[in-house]
Amino acid sequence: TFKLKKGELLTVLGPSGCGKTTLLNITAGFLRPTSGKITLGGNEINGPGVERGMVFQQGALFEWLTVAQNVNFGLRMKKVDQKTTEKKVEEWLEIVGLKGFGNTPTYQLSGGMQQRVALARCLINDPELILMDEPLGALDALTREKMQSLVLKIWKETGKTIILIT
């Protein structure tokens, strides 16, 4: 049992196979707990929801789309108007250090850049809780350090609640 307050950053560490990703998948609503329940804001989690955003170990991007098309995917599904979408995409690409890459196909990006696209795609939807499943695991040491700093910066500036599996 654990409680996470709004605006906290929880890092879950442990060896392979100990259940870190299972915990995250239950929190995301992808799996159901075998016993007990999990709640967010007093509401039981029974499936995926827009109040939770997920960043996977591998970017899970649509490689046939551009960076901007990947980032704005959720807003397009919500039918947010194009002008608002374009403005938000520009803002988040600048925050994650990808200003000027909006028209670049994601398959042309390095692993670290792809993870920043995935992070922007999650954050642009303004989720209450951000779930990160080993987003730094496939990155080289220098890129990992930069990505850690970026996640901390975003956490401090936005006050988002984050669960980070590593």
Question: Whereabouts are the PLM-identified features?
Answer:
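Helix-to-loop junction immediately C-terminal to a conserved catalytic motif
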Residues: A28
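Catalytic Walker B motif of ABC-type/P-loop ATPase nucleotide-binding domains
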Residues: I130-D133
